[in-house]
């Protein structure tokens, strides 16, 4: 029987917490003026590579998102060095940052469902308005 949480998953969870702390306290890049949240980390099986998924608080502007990802990618060496001090790993993984749009898509889907429910309620209250003669 396989373990439910293997070492890569445990390291990814700890790394997610540590990167969030580093981004909050140590990174002072003006391109990251918006609040940055680490939404997930995926580790390779050999723990040599990590995909870090981030979201930004004010992510309406696509150029700001691209600039934020670029800033994080440029700071990845610094983040790795701080991560090496915070975590006890033989090899600190190479970090690659990706924008996670699942939060934005989830909110969009929620708004669509809310609008459909609202429209359906209006049709139930006023059934005569929707009939055509």
Swiss-Prot record:
Superkingdom, natural source: Bacteria
Subcellular location: Cytoplasm
One Gene Ontology term from the biological process aspect of the record: maturation of SSU-rRNA
Keywords: Cytoplasm, Ribosome biogenesis
PROSITE patterns from the UniProt entry: RBFA
Annotated Gene Ontology cellular component terms: cytosol
Cysteine disulfide links: none
Gene Ontology terms, MF aspect: ribosomal small subunit binding
HAMAP family recorded: RbfA
Role of this protein: One of several proteins that assist in the late maturation steps of the functional core of the 30S ribosomal subunit. Associates with free 30S ribosomal subunits (but not with 30S subunits that are part of 70S ribosomes or polysomes). Required for efficient processing of 16S rRNA. May interact with the 5'-terminal helix region of 16S rRNA.
Family to which this protein belongs: Belongs to the RbfA family.
Quaternary structure and partners: Monomer. Binds 30S ribosomal subunits, but not 50S ribosomal subunits or 70S ribosomes.
UniProt-recorded name of the protein: Ribosome-binding factor A
Source organism (scientific name): Salmonella schwarzengrund (strain CVM19633)
Record lineage: Bacteria, Pseudomonadati, Pseudomonadota, Gammaproteobacteria, Enterobacterales
Gene: rbfA
């Amino acid at each position: 029987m396989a373990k439910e949480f293997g070492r890569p998953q445990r390291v990814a969870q700890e790394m997610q917490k540590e990167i969030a702390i580093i981004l909050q306290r140590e990174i002072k890049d003006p391109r990251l003026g918006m609040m940055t949240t680490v939404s997930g980390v995926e580790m390779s099986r050999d723990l040599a590579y990590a995909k870090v998924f981030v979201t930004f608080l004010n992510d309406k502007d696509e150029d700001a998102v691209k600039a934020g990802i670029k800033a994080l990618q440029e700071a990845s060496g610094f983040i790795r060095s701080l991560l090496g001090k915070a975590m006890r790993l033989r090899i600190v993984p190479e970090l690659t940052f990706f924008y996670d749009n699942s939060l934005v898509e989830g909110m969009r889907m929620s708004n669509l469902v809310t609008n459909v429910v609202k429209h359906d309620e209006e049709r139930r209250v006023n059934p005569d308005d929707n009939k055509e003669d």
